[in-house]
A protein has these predicted regions:
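Short glycine-/aliphatic-rich beta-strand segments at the starts of folded cytosolic domains
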Residues: 2-17
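A generic structural signal for well-ordered coil/turn residues at beta-strand boundaries
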Residues: 4-6, 31, 42-44, 178
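Beta-strand secondary-structure signal
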Residues: 9, 45-47, 181
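Short amphipathic alpha-helix segments
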Residues: 13-34
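Short alpha-helical segments enriched in small residues
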Residues: 26-27, 54-212
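Short beta-strand
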Residues: 35-40
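A generic structural motif
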Residues: 42-52
Length: 212
């Protein structure tokens, strides 16, 4: 019989640090569980160490209940692997509407097993000899003679890519000064997030996809 664990590592993305500290501070004394965490950018690795398996379980369940949307995995699970798993589970295809988004996602997903089943790596979308120009044409047609700013064009491209390819999700990216504006289009609507160019935009975009 396998020995029950008294320690684990939880992985979160986008969890507010103040709320995380508050949640750990509310652990019941009888759980006899200590927590340490380290954050970089939006990602947090949180290590739990308990005196007993039951204490560990209760502490982990408490965090899961409070940070359900932010908690993406445990142990060695990467955010990219969590995204591929979510896409597979919901039978969704993800494409990119421009090379900038492709560069962010392809480097993260190329080594994840099964990624080719749920992500086109540009083959059906922006890098396709016919679909790519079609996406650009459809996107610019929305503005007629007007020259759109980079963010509006990225949003229009993402919406066009989803329709041209017939995918459930389409991601885009635009530069705006010292920032990157990340775009995600789905049948439900569109999401935008602005991150500093110095931040890891690929991880923020992956998190948007995971939550969609």
């Amino acid at each position: 019989m396998a020995e029950e664990k008294t320690s684990c590592v939880l992985r979160l993305f986008g969890a507010p640090q103040g709320q995380l500290a508050g949640a750990v501070g509310q652990f019941a004394p009888q759980w006899k569980t200590q927590a340490q965490w380290k954050s970089r950018g939006g990602e947090t690795l949180l290590a739990l160490q308990a005196a007993s398996p039951s204490g560990l379980k209760k502490a982990a369940q408490s965090l899961q209940a409070q940070f359900e949307a932010d908690l993406y995995g445990a142990g060695d699970t990467s955010l990219a692997a969590a995204v591929v798993n979510a896409l597979e589970t919901h039978d969704r295809l993800l494409v990119c509407s421009d090379a900038a988004a492709g560069a962010l996602l392809e480097a993260r997903l190329e080594t994840v097993p099964g990624a080719e089943k749920v992500f086109d790596f540009g083959a059906l979308s922006y890098a396709h000899p016919k679909a790519g120009p079609q996406i650009e044409k459809r996107a610019r047609a929305r503005f007629k003679a007007e020259e759109p700013d980079a963010v509006r064009l990225a949003l229009a491209r993402a919406q066009a890519a989803r329709r041209v390819v017939g995918s459930e999700l389409a991601a885009g990216c635009a530069e705006r000064g010292s920032e990157k504006v990340l775009v995600l289009s789905s049948k439900k609507g569109c999401w935008l997030r602005t991150v500093p160019s110095s931040d890891n935009a690929a991880l923020w975009l992956l998190d948007m996809i995971r939550r969609a």
